[in-house]
Amino acid sequence: MSLREEGGFCVAVLEGRNLTKTFRQGKLEVPVLHGVSLAVERGEVVALEGPSGSGKTTLLCILGCLLTPTTGRIVIDGQVITAGRPERLRDVRRRSIGFVFQQFNLFASLTASENVQYALNLKGWRGLKARRESDRVLDAVGLGDRKDFRPRDLSGGQRQRIAVARALAGPASVILADEPTGNLDSESGKIVLALFREMARTESRGLLIVTHDPLVRSVADRVMTIRDGRLTHGEA
């Protein structure tokens, strides 16, 4: 049974069910997450807030199949993927999840278009198909006329928009963003957040944003708060 249902049908594109995470430090087992459950629907923007050390980035990495939970399950597009082999988890990351991080992580030697196409190549998109998709998402984020520029020739806000375009390129149904406005001025942050809101609605993506930025509340459908590894507000 899904965490959020409507009329008997699952409407969540991403679910975490009773997630826990424990890290070993020497002889000690240190718990970081305690039975966290959440769901993100298609077309929905969810903000996840919490102080430093609260477990929010660990939770994001687990939901993105970058870390394995100690217990609990991840469900993406209705499929349980937690127990899969490493190769399957890698394929899920490439096919179903787009990532946006505070650090842009762009290749300095590649153009905006080539940066997006590189991500598409990892998803199995090649040649004309990849170029057309790159053009589409760069147009969508307002950088169609900058597609042949390299990152050094663009502003911080424009570089982050390339990162957004890269996450949106291809079939990803879930976008996970970790402090995406952290290195941006207020105006650039507003532009990036407006892009997130528009893309979630027009392309039916589910978007989870880990943030300290109060501006994110202006585009979020729901706000969840995590403290000491537990959701204290907005739990599914």
Which residues fall in each region the model found?
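ABC-family P-loop ATPase nucleotide-binding domain
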Residues: M1-T22, T232-A236
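ABC family nucleotide-binding domain
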Residues: A12-I226
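H-loop (His-switch) and adjacent beta-strand-loop-beta switch element
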Residues: V223-E235
